[in-house]
């Protein structure tokens, strides 16, 4: 956590910013909640990173994206913007494998009309594949499943209409296709 990070500064840089945060929390009787605050805001940051990256990958004719930073900026003015601390160590907010699920050379994406569905509604989605990897994939290589957190499968299928080509994002259901 931020308070524990103070001990990592062993050189000439004095973490006055973190000490001020620690002192402020201590004066307010909230120092024991510092880890909770860090985790809550950090988990939100991870969700927002995912949303931003997926939106970029779904954008037709976009060739990439740039993030402000993945680690906190410790310089002139504190910017605790990263999923990693200023020493590039994990803050425990997201596992590397989970991050690679939405930030990798090949990323499966789902498009749907809204984020909240009622139990009596039919969920409809279109599968997209963002492929900036070295290989081209055929429709016979795509299998998908809609599952819950416990692994219960609600629907599954194959990509008989899908064509995933190199350096393109293509819609599995064929509504739009981006080609060179």
PLM ranges: what are they?
Residues 167-179:
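Aromatic sugar-binding surface patches on proteins
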Residues 1-158, 166:
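Substrate-binding clefts and catalytic carboxylate motifs of secreted carbohydrate-active enzymes
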């Amino acid at each position: 956590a931020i308070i524990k990070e103070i001990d990592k500064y062993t050189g000439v840089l004095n973490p006055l910013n973190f000490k001020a945060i620690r002192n402020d929390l201590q004066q307010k009787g909230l120092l024991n909640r510092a880890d909770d605050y860090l985790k809550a805001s950090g988990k939100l940051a991870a969700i927002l990173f995912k949303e931003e990256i997926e939106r970029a990958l779904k954008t037709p004719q976009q060739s990439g994206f740039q993030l402000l930073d993945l680690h906190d900026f410790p310089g002139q003015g504190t910017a605790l913007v990263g999923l990693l601390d200023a020493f590039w160590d994990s803050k425990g907010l997201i596992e590397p494998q989970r991050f690679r699920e939405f930030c990798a050379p090949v990323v499966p994406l789902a498009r749907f009309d809204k984020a909240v569905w009622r139990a009596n509604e039919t969920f409809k989605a279109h599968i997209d594949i963002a492929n900036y990897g070295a290989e081209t994939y055929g429709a016979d290589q795509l299998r998908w499943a809609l599952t819950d957190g416990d692994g219960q499968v609600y629907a599954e299928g194959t990509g008989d209409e899908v064509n995933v080509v190199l350096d393109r994002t293509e819609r599995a259901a064929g509504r739009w296709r981006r080609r060179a």
